[in-house]
Design a protein with these regions (language model features):
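Active-site beta-strand-loop-beta-strand hairpin of nuclease catalytic cores
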Residues: 74-99
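Surface-exposed interaction regions that form or flank ligand-binding interfaces
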Residues: 1-68, 75-79, 102-182
Length: 182
Protein backbone atom coordinates (compact mmCIF):
# COMPACT_ATOMS: atom_id res chain seq x y z
CA UNK A 1 0.00 0.00 0.00
CA UNK A 2 1.25 3.45 -0.81
CA UNK A 3 0.29 6.22 1.58
CA UNK A 4 2.20 8.62 -0.67
CA UNK A 5 3.15 7.04 -4.00
CA UNK A 6 6.31 7.73 -5.95
CA UNK A 7 5.66 10.56 -8.38
CA UNK A 8 7.66 13.06 -10.36
CA UNK A 9 8.34 16.03 -8.06
CA UNK A 10 6.72 19.30 -9.11
CA UNK A 11 10.06 21.11 -8.82
CA UNK A 12 11.66 18.67 -11.26
CA UNK A 13 8.87 19.20 -13.80
CA UNK A 14 9.15 22.98 -13.44
CA UNK A 15 12.93 22.97 -13.83
CA UNK A 16 12.71 20.72 -16.90
CA UNK A 17 10.46 23.28 -18.57
CA UNK A 18 12.81 26.15 -17.67
CA UNK A 19 16.17 24.57 -18.47
CA UNK A 20 16.03 25.40 -22.20
CA UNK A 21 15.04 29.01 -21.52
CA UNK A 22 17.83 29.94 -19.15
CA UNK A 23 21.60 29.73 -18.95
CA UNK A 24 21.51 29.74 -15.14
CA UNK A 25 24.02 27.13 -13.97
CA UNK A 26 22.29 26.90 -10.57
CA UNK A 27 19.07 25.86 -12.34
CA UNK A 28 20.95 23.24 -14.38
CA UNK A 29 22.73 21.90 -11.27
CA UNK A 30 19.47 21.68 -9.34
CA UNK A 31 17.82 19.91 -12.29
CA UNK A 32 20.69 17.41 -12.41
CA UNK A 33 20.43 16.66 -8.66
CA UNK A 34 16.64 16.26 -8.75
CA UNK A 35 16.84 13.98 -11.80
CA UNK A 36 19.50 11.87 -10.09
CA UNK A 37 17.39 11.61 -6.92
CA UNK A 38 14.32 10.59 -8.95
CA UNK A 39 16.32 7.95 -10.85
CA UNK A 40 17.60 6.47 -7.57
CA UNK A 41 14.03 6.33 -6.26
CA UNK A 42 12.97 4.42 -9.38
CA UNK A 43 15.92 2.04 -9.01
CA UNK A 44 14.86 1.30 -5.43
CA UNK A 45 11.22 0.92 -6.49
CA UNK A 46 12.30 -1.69 -9.07
CA UNK A 47 13.96 -3.68 -6.26
CA UNK A 48 10.97 -3.22 -3.97
CA UNK A 49 8.69 -4.57 -6.70
CA UNK A 50 10.66 -7.84 -6.68
CA UNK A 51 9.32 -8.74 -3.24
CA UNK A 52 5.86 -8.97 -1.71
CA UNK A 53 5.47 -5.50 -0.25
CA UNK A 54 1.68 -5.36 -0.19
CA UNK A 55 1.77 -5.27 3.61
CA UNK A 56 4.10 -2.24 3.69
CA UNK A 57 2.90 1.32 3.92
CA UNK A 58 5.18 3.44 1.75
CA UNK A 59 5.64 7.18 1.96
CA UNK A 60 7.84 8.39 -0.89
CA UNK A 61 9.68 11.72 -1.12
CA UNK A 62 9.14 13.03 2.40
CA UNK A 63 10.60 16.45 3.15
CA UNK A 64 10.55 18.12 6.55
CA UNK A 65 10.26 21.82 7.22
CA UNK A 66 13.98 21.70 8.06
CA UNK A 67 14.71 20.67 4.44
CA UNK A 68 15.63 17.13 5.40
CA UNK A 69 14.68 14.91 2.49
CA UNK A 70 13.91 11.25 3.10
CA UNK A 71 13.48 9.26 -0.12
CA UNK A 72 11.26 6.59 1.40
CA UNK A 73 9.58 5.73 4.68
CA UNK A 74 8.31 2.16 4.98
CA UNK A 75 5.98 1.28 7.84
CA UNK A 76 5.45 -2.38 8.63
CA UNK A 77 3.60 -4.03 11.50
CA UNK A 78 6.78 -4.27 13.51
CA UNK A 79 8.98 -1.29 12.51
CA UNK A 80 9.44 2.01 10.74
CA UNK A 81 12.24 2.15 8.15
CA UNK A 82 13.73 5.43 6.90
CA UNK A 83 15.75 5.38 3.67
CA UNK A 84 17.97 8.03 2.13
CA UNK A 85 19.42 7.22 -1.31
CA UNK A 86 22.64 8.43 -2.90
CA UNK A 87 25.30 7.46 -5.41
CA UNK A 88 28.48 8.48 -3.59
CA UNK A 89 31.60 6.79 -4.89
CA UNK A 90 35.00 5.91 -3.47
CA UNK A 91 36.29 5.42 0.05
CA UNK A 92 34.37 7.12 2.87
CA UNK A 93 34.50 7.13 6.64
CA UNK A 94 32.15 8.20 9.41
CA UNK A 95 33.61 10.81 11.73
CA UNK A 96 33.02 11.23 15.46
CA UNK A 97 29.99 13.45 14.79
CA UNK A 98 28.31 10.81 12.64
CA UNK A 99 29.03 12.62 9.37
CA UNK A 100 29.86 10.62 6.25
CA UNK A 101 33.09 11.96 4.73
CA UNK A 102 34.76 11.18 1.41
CA UNK A 103 38.27 10.09 2.40
CA UNK A 104 39.85 11.55 -0.76
CA UNK A 105 38.05 14.88 -1.27
CA UNK A 106 36.98 15.38 2.37
CA UNK A 107 33.49 16.24 1.13
CA UNK A 108 31.06 15.95 4.04
CA UNK A 109 27.64 14.37 3.55
CA UNK A 110 24.91 14.87 6.16
CA UNK A 111 22.83 11.82 5.15
CA UNK A 112 23.33 9.77 8.33
CA UNK A 113 22.89 12.81 10.55
CA UNK A 114 19.66 13.74 8.72
CA UNK A 115 18.35 10.18 9.05
CA UNK A 116 18.99 10.26 12.80
CA UNK A 117 17.25 13.64 13.16
CA UNK A 118 14.27 12.23 11.30
CA UNK A 119 14.34 9.06 13.41
CA UNK A 120 13.94 11.04 16.63
CA UNK A 121 11.24 13.21 15.05
CA UNK A 122 9.29 10.06 14.13
CA UNK A 123 9.72 8.64 17.64
CA UNK A 124 8.47 11.92 19.15
CA UNK A 125 5.27 11.99 17.06
CA UNK A 126 4.33 8.32 17.53
CA UNK A 127 1.27 7.70 19.65
CA UNK A 128 2.09 6.13 23.01
CA UNK A 129 0.62 2.82 21.84
CA UNK A 130 3.19 2.70 19.01
CA UNK A 131 6.28 3.77 20.91
CA UNK A 132 7.47 0.18 21.04
CA UNK A 133 7.95 0.21 17.26
CA UNK A 134 11.65 0.47 16.45
CA UNK A 135 12.76 3.02 13.85
CA UNK A 136 15.56 1.87 11.55
CA UNK A 137 17.65 4.16 9.35
CA UNK A 138 19.49 3.19 6.19
CA UNK A 139 21.68 5.31 3.96
CA UNK A 140 21.44 3.41 0.67
CA UNK A 141 24.57 3.48 -1.51
CA UNK A 142 23.70 2.79 -5.15
CA UNK A 143 27.21 3.29 -6.54
CA UNK A 144 29.08 -0.01 -6.57
CA UNK A 145 32.42 1.77 -6.03
CA UNK A 146 31.34 3.11 -2.62
CA UNK A 147 33.43 1.71 0.23
CA UNK A 148 33.36 2.39 3.94
CA UNK A 149 36.68 2.32 5.75
CA UNK A 150 37.18 -0.59 8.14
CA UNK A 151 37.18 1.68 11.22
CA UNK A 152 33.67 3.00 10.54
CA UNK A 153 30.62 1.12 11.77
CA UNK A 154 28.43 0.17 8.77
CA UNK A 155 25.17 -0.04 10.76
CA UNK A 156 23.35 2.75 8.90
CA UNK A 157 24.88 1.91 5.50
CA UNK A 158 23.17 -0.34 2.97
CA UNK A 159 25.25 -1.21 -0.10
CA UNK A 160 23.65 -1.83 -3.49
CA UNK A 161 24.06 -5.62 -3.31
CA UNK A 162 22.50 -5.64 0.18
CA UNK A 163 19.27 -3.84 -0.77
CA UNK A 164 17.21 -6.78 -2.03
CA UNK A 165 18.22 -9.16 0.83
CA UNK A 166 17.39 -6.39 3.33
CA UNK A 167 13.95 -5.83 1.76
CA UNK A 168 13.29 -9.58 1.72
CA UNK A 169 14.13 -9.80 5.45
CA UNK A 170 11.81 -6.85 6.14
CA UNK A 171 9.01 -8.60 4.28
CA UNK A 172 9.54 -11.94 6.04
CA UNK A 173 9.73 -10.30 9.49
CA UNK A 174 6.58 -8.30 8.84
CA UNK A 175 4.67 -11.40 7.69
CA UNK A 176 5.79 -13.32 10.80
CA UNK A 177 4.54 -10.50 12.99
CA UNK A 178 1.16 -10.52 11.18
CA UNK A 179 0.78 -14.29 11.67
CA UNK A 180 1.49 -13.91 15.40
CA UNK A 181 -1.36 -11.40 15.69
CA UNK A 182 -3.91 -13.67 13.96
Amino acid sequence: MHVKPLSKPHTLTALESLVHRTSDTHCAAQLYELNKRYQLEHAFMALLNQIDHTHFECIWQYQTHHNIYINLIIITDNAVHLFKFNDYSGLHHIDGDGMLINSTTYTTHADISELHCMKYSVINVMPETSTQLPVYTKCVMFNETFMLDIHSHPGDILLKDQILPYLERMSICSKKKKKQHH
